[in-house]
A protein has these predicted regions:
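Flexible mid-to-C-terminal extensions adjoining Fe-S/redox cofactors in radical SAM and related proteins
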Residues: 157-158, 163-230
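Short, acidic, Ser/Thr-enriched surface-loop or helix-capping motifs
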Residues: 152-153
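Short, P/G- and charge-enriched loop/turn segments at secondary-structure junctions
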Residues: 134-139, 194-197
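Flexible glycine/acidic-rich beta-alpha junction loops that bind and position SAM and/or redox cofactors
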Residues: 92-96, 116-132, 165-168
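Short, small/polar residue-rich loop motifs at catalytic or cofactor-binding pockets
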Residues: 144-146
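Radical SAM/AdoMet-radical enzyme domain recognition
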Residues: 1-110, 114, 118
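Short hydrophobic/aromatic beta-strand element in the GNAT-like acyltransferase core
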Residues: 149
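The −1 position to Zn-ligating cysteines in a subset of zinc-ribbon hairpins
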Residues: 139-142, 205
Length: 230
């Protein structure tokens, strides 16, 4: 991981970040990450409730994760470094009160520079009132993925989408073509055109994507809150 981060920064990648549960963020690993040039560290906390957290994140220990994250932030700040930016992600569970939401935010900002919230709503609960599920509905959704990123497997296969875990949308392999060639390939251009033309549903992997059915009108909604130092 450290080698990959350093390599990406050496090659001029502007924004290098990764998601983690934080359980393996030891002091040694923290030092290595701080030296690597990493731009952002994103940690999924989901809830500040220990019991609920350990039910959601099986095998993860809440106290260990929180301790690791606090130590990472302290180590970064002791160096006088502005980066990497630390972000904690939480889930807004059904029935959460404004007071609980505020408490989650305050808790998150003791651990990180910014906090992201994602509201959990089961789309099937809103079929009667959500026009996305009505006959003839045409979504205005345009996915940003093929315009902004590439996902690469350990085998070198390339997909235009980080949610394409089975790599059904493979557009090439870096062992056979350069990233520039793949980025400008007909496969990528076709993906972009279908997105711009509002025809993402013609792509098998995309037609049932949660981003398409949930993302363009706020189900789930997401917002971020930054701490006072940023």
């Amino acid at each position: 991981l450290i080698k990959m981060i350093k390599y990406a920064k050496e090659k001029g990648i502007v924004d290098v970040h990764f998601h983690s549960h934080g359980g393996l963020l030891t002091e040694k690993k923290s030092e290595e990450l701080l030296d690597s040039g990493l731009d952002k560290l994103l940690i999924s906390i989901d809830t500040p409730n220990k019991e609920k957290y350990e039910k959601l994140r099986v095998l993860s220990k809440f106290d260990n994760v929180i301790s690791n994250l606090k130590k990472f932030k302290e180590l970064r700040d002791s160096r006088g470094s502005l980066g990497p930016l630390i972000k904690c992600n939480f889930i807004e569970f059904p029935g959460i009160t404004k007071e609980e939401l505020k408490a989650n935010l305050e808790f998150g900002l003791t651990l990180a520079d910014c906090v992201g919230f994602q509201e959990y709503i089961d789309p099937t609960c809103t079929i009667g009132e959500n026009k996305k599920f009505q006959p003839g509905y045409k979504s205005s959704f345009i996915c940003q993925q093929p315009f902004t990123r590439l996902a690469i497997t350990e085998d070198g296969n390339v997909s235009p989408c980080c949610l394409d875990h089975e790599y059904e949308l493979s557009v090439g392999n870096i062992k056979e073509n350069s990233l520039s060639e793949i980025w400008k390939s007909s496969g990528m251009e076709n993906m972009r055109k279908k997105q711009k033309d509002g025809k993402f549903y013609e792509i098998d992997r995309c037609k049932n994507c949660e981003m398409a059915t949930n993302g363009d009108e706020g189900i789930p909604t997401q917002f971020e809150k930054y701490g006072p130092t940023l």
